[in-house]
Structures are given as structure tokens and as C-alpha cells.
Design a protein with these regions (language model features):
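Class I Rossmann-like S-adenosyl-L-methionine
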Residues: 1-170
Length: 170
């Protein structure tokens, strides 16, 4: 039985080119040289062949990276391969689970949706990320706030109120 790669790619939620584009875009966003929406818009203008579905997936994943930058960046250090790829895979995994862009809002579904783009060893790595209990993370990592905001918050409210307040702001 011969597998039609084009048919498989047509049903895939994420494709290798999504990871490549996202890796480039996240690298640019992480510089914080310009507003994120401007960087994303400029990138899409430079890539006219990207379709609406591609743009939606890449944009959602890039903003997921920015929202959870602390957590994603910290876990990305544990992976192998280019950092941009690791950041892109984690961002895609998050949106497949949390934003309804995947087949189901579960880690198992997200892994299936990413099966077309992951290399050997990356599935287990993404599973470890999906199995992390958020409560086990350090407070700064859990709330994904920049350190200067977390410190300012700690200076202005009682310590026992910092975490609940920061989580409410997300």
C-alpha cells in the first residue's frame, strides 16, 4: 500500500514549513526591536505565498510564544537541535492544545497533529512538556511575566497575593 504524501500533508495541522517560518519569526520577535504585531505583519508581507490557514497558525503560535515566553524558553533549553525550532515546536504544541487549532484540546491530539513535523526524540520531549504540572513551576515561570513586572508586583502587594494576582492578569 502506497501512502500519498500530498493527501497526508493536506490533512496535517502543522507542516514542516510552518515550523521553519515560525522559527524565523520567533527569532525576530524575541529581539523586541519593534511591536509584535508590526513584526508579524511585516513578515507576512515578505511571504506572499503563505495562505490564510498558514498565516493563522503561524500568527497564533508566535503570540503564544510571547504570552508564555518564560516557560517556553526555559523548557526549550532541555531539547536538542536549533533553538528556534524548539521554540517553534513548543509554541505549536501549546496552540494545538489550548486554542482549538488542533484536532482536540488535549496533549495527545496535539502530538498527533505535530507528527508530520517532529523528528525522532521530539515527541517524547513534547510529551514531557505536556506532562508538567503548572503548579510545580517556579512562580515567575508559572505566570510568564517579565522579571521586572514580577518584582514591581512583589514590591506593591503582599507576597501571598502576588501569585493569584499575576495569574488573574494572564
Amino acid at each position: 500500500m502506497r501512502i500519498d504524501q500530498k493527501a497526508v500533508a493536506a490533512r496535517a495541522k502543522a507542516l514542516p514549513q510552518h515550523v521553519e517560518h515560525l522559527s524565523v519569526l520567533i527569532t525576530e520577535l524575541a529581539r523586541f526591536a519593534h511591536p509584535a504585531d508590526m513584526v508579524v505583519s511585516r513578515y507576512f508581507r515578505s511571504q506572499p505565498k503563505l495562505g490564510n490557514r498558514d498565516r493563522a497558525l503561524i500568527a497564533e503560535a508566535s503570540f503564544a510564544f510571547l504570552r508564555r515566553k518564560t516557560e517556553i524558553s526555559q523548557f526549550a533549553e532541555s531539547g536538542q537541535g536549533p533553538l528556534g525550532r524548539r521554540l517553534a515546536l513548543l509554541s505549536l504544541f501549546i496552540i494545538m492544545v489550548e486554542s482549538g487549532l488542533g484536532s482536540g484540546n488535549r496533549a495527545e491530539s496535539a502530538l498527533a497533529d505535530l507528527a508530520f513535523v517532529v523528528h525522532p526524540g521530539e515527541i517524547e520531549w513534547l510529551q514531557r512538556f505536556g506532562n508538567i504540572e503548572r503548579e510545580s513551576l517556579a512562580p515567575l515561570t508559572r505566570v510568564n511575566l517579565p522579571e521586572w513586572i514580577w518584582n514591581a508586583l512583589g514590591a506593591s502587594v503582599p507576597k501571598d497575593e502576588c501569585l493569584p494576582l499575576a495569574e488573574a492578569m494572564l
